[in-house]
């Protein structure tokens, strides 16, 4: 029995999904109704699933822009504010030594969001501005991750995520409303972001216990829900130039 308990199954689960006490509780004593350990297992599993999914979540958006050779319908201000919010989460989480499963997707989404920023600028004819933006962003990121940056500054950056998320999503919602369609906005990306932010409310409470982190995801879920609702509402709407081509 001891050999089974110390087998490869345990070596995979214990460092990744469960503390040893919970592994013993669930898989040695077979107590599958132990709520605290089940919460840990669910939170870690969801967290790792979100992190894995984040590797792909914005790729449909990137491919849609590349395929159309256009970023029509995407608000640059909204994308940049989302980049600010994601960067704040990454820096705050690293500074506070939060487990990677509780914030890892923010890192991958940051890389994909900066790519979208560059594509929007490129297809607007501002490629040089995009390169300058990337250089400035990298410099600022290194400065914020430096030990010389006060914790108060990092905390303030994370607190600014709420207005950044709200304003950014409202700008995108306003763009959609003004255009009467969602342009090159990817429905897959929008719905994945909505689902991920909802799941993150639970995992951030469970894994970090940080009300600031949880609050950001609550607000993010509401805003992502608004954009998702617009995607459904404008599902059959097409940009004017497409109507002209069909006529």
Swiss-Prot record:
GO annotation (BP), single: oligosaccharide biosynthetic process
Keywords linked to the UniProt accession: Acetylation, Membrane, Repeat, Transmembrane, Transmembrane helix, Transport
Entry's transmembrane regions: 46-66, 74-94, 103-123, 128-145, 151-171, 185-205, 213-233
Subcellular location: Membrane
UniProt superkingdom: Eukaryota
Coiled-coil regions, chain positions: none
InterPro entries in the cross-refs: MannP-dilichol_defect-1, PQ-loop_rpt
The keyword Membrane is annotated on this UniProt entry: yes
Name this polypeptide is given: Mannose-P-dolichol utilization defect 1 protein
